[in-house]
Amino acid sequence: MMIGLTGGIASGKSSVAKMMEELGLPIVDADQVARDVVEPGMPAYEAIVAHFGTGVVNDDGTLNRKALGSIVFQQEEERRVLNEIVHPAVRRQMQQQKEQLIRSGEKTIVFDIPLLYESNLFYLVEKVLLVYVDEHTQLQRLMNRDQAGKDDAIHRIRSQRPLESKRDRADAIIDNSGTLDATKRQLIDILKRWKVIPEDQ
C-alpha cells in the first residue's frame, strides 16, 4: 500500500513520520528529495543556474536558497519557472525510490509530502493520511518552534491550503492536538484498519 502522509506547517507531521519509521515502514521524504535534486551537478541544479544566473550560487557551488527565494517570492513568473524545473525532477526521483523499494520487497511505502494537495501528487498514493490540528494550536506551535512573531506565523500558515479544507480528500485523519501517546494510538489504529500492521501489534 502506498500511503501519502501530509499535514500543514507545525501540524506535527514529522513526529508521525518518525513513528511510522519506528514501526518499520520505509519513508520517501519529499522535502529531502527536493533538496537532493538541486545538489551541484544534478540536471535541475544546472537548469536553475542557467536560468537564474550565478547570483543564486554560493562560493562553495551549492545553491543560495535565500537569494533564490527572494527572487521567486517577489516574482510569480520566476516562481513558475523554478517550479517547472524542480517539480518534475522531484516526481521522477520519488517514482524511482518507490520502484526501488518495491523491487526490494516492501509492501507498504510512506510518502511524506507536506504539499501533497498543493502539488496534486495523489497519483503516487492509494491512501491519504492527514495530520490535523486546529489553526489556534498550529499558530501557537509555529510561534514556539520557530520563535516567529504572530503576524509572520499567520502569514506562513495562510500561504498553504487550510488544513480544514484538506479533510475531505483524506482517507484517515490523525488529530494531533493532544499528547504524542494519543497520536501514536490513533496511528496504530489506522494502520491496523488498513492491514499494514498486524492486529496484535
UniProtKB/Swiss-Prot annotation:
GO terms for molecular function: ATP binding; dephospho-CoA kinase activity. Signal peptide: none annotated. It comes from the Bacteria. HAMAP family: Dephospho_CoA_kinase (MF_00376). Residues 2-201 form the DPCK domain. SUPFAM superfamilies: P-loop containing nucleoside triphosphate hydrolases. This is Dephospho-CoA kinase. Disulfide bonds: none annotated. InterPro entries: Depp_CoAkinase, P-loop_NTPase. Belongs to the CoaE family. The keyword Nucleotide-binding applies. GO terms for cellular component: cytoplasm. It catalyses: 3'-dephospho-CoA + ATP = ADP + CoA + H(+). ATP binds at residues 10-15. Keywords: ATP-binding, Coenzyme A biosynthesis, Cytoplasm, Kinase, Nucleotide-binding, Transferase. Pathway: Cofactor biosynthesis; coenzyme A biosynthesis; CoA from (R)-pantothenate: step 5/5. PANTHER family: BIFUNCTIONAL COENZYME A SYNTHASE-RELATED, DEPHOSPHO-COA KINASE-RELATED. CDD domains: DPCK. Its EC number is 2.7.1.24.
